[in-house]
Amino acid sequence: MARAEGDSWDVASSVGATAAMVAAGRAVATRDPRGLIDDPYAAPLVRAVGIEFFTKVADGEFDMTELDPSSAAEMQARIDEMALRTRFFDDYFLASTAGGIRQVVILASGLDSRAYRLPWPDGTVVYEIDQPAVIDFKTSTLAGIGAEPTAERRTVAIDLREDWPAALRAAGFDSAAPTAWCAEGLLIYLPPEAQDLLFDNVTALSATGSTVATEYVPGILNFDAEKARAASAQMRERGLDLDMPSLVYHGERKHVMEYLTSLGWTMAGLPRTDLFAKHGVPMVAHDNDPLGEIVYVSGTYQNR
């Protein structure tokens, strides 16, 4: 079903189901002996969502590289990228807090468990913003397995298309304190104008010394829906009907690094190939990736 203004979802439908997909990838990466990431909560969260395909992947009952033996290396590269994407944002948060930041905001937090698994310094407050059904699901699921946050976790149950800055302030957010902002895997699900507004709001709430991390996804500009559907054909054959082209907003939008720079941020970009090289992971080109050469970006705010 195509996106519509004001649409909503839970963790098993629409955009919400993509959180289970990402969490399944983190579960696979956690089992990987290379130890790129450690997310002990990924698999329990995926099981609780209840999408059979993702549960089998998360539990190791199905190997994603077996979807298409002719492109096993390409699929392994996709799995590795999920691990490295997670590692990029993990390292970003650790660097931000090592620099003295004690206020963190995760935008569209989904099934992100960083508030429970990262070694946050004493006094760190982690705000998670997402739709109410998603927030409630994760909170209750992790409480049910006895998980406890490693920072002060404050949830902000609101759609990012609503007045989330006001809701964030109401939860105790201090705009006078530097903040580490994260928009991981979010921008492709926002219309172009909503992407700009998101970062306008982030900037308005940021004190000097705040940091931000997100991705630049060039393939969304000239998104090939048929290529995307072809890439997931084998998953559909196994009962997973997740039509990604209907969930993303494609077409012209501003380059996120350039836009943030114009707002007073000093930005740096790490292309996917360099991210792989940084961690010594072999990169297998997959030319049929509809999202193109993703760049992982981070920056620091200088103006106030």
From Swiss-Prot:
InterPro entries: Ppm1/Ppm2/Tcmp (IPR007213), SAM-dependent_MTases_sf (IPR029063), SAM_mthyl_Trfase_ML2640-like (IPR011610). It is an enzyme of class 2 (transferase). One of its GO terms (molecular function) is methyltransferase activity. It comes from the Bacteria. Keywords: Methyltransferase, S-adenosyl-L-methionine, Transferase. Its EC number is 2.1.1.-. Pfam families: LCM. S-adenosyl-L-methionine binds at residues 130, 159-160. One of its GO terms (biological process) is methylation. Belongs to the UPF0677 family. Exhibits S-adenosyl-L-methionine-dependent methyltransferase activity. This is Putative S-adenosyl-L-methionine-dependent methyltransferase Mjls_1071. The lineage of its organism: Bacteria, Bacillati, Actinomycetota, Actinomycetes, Mycobacteriales.
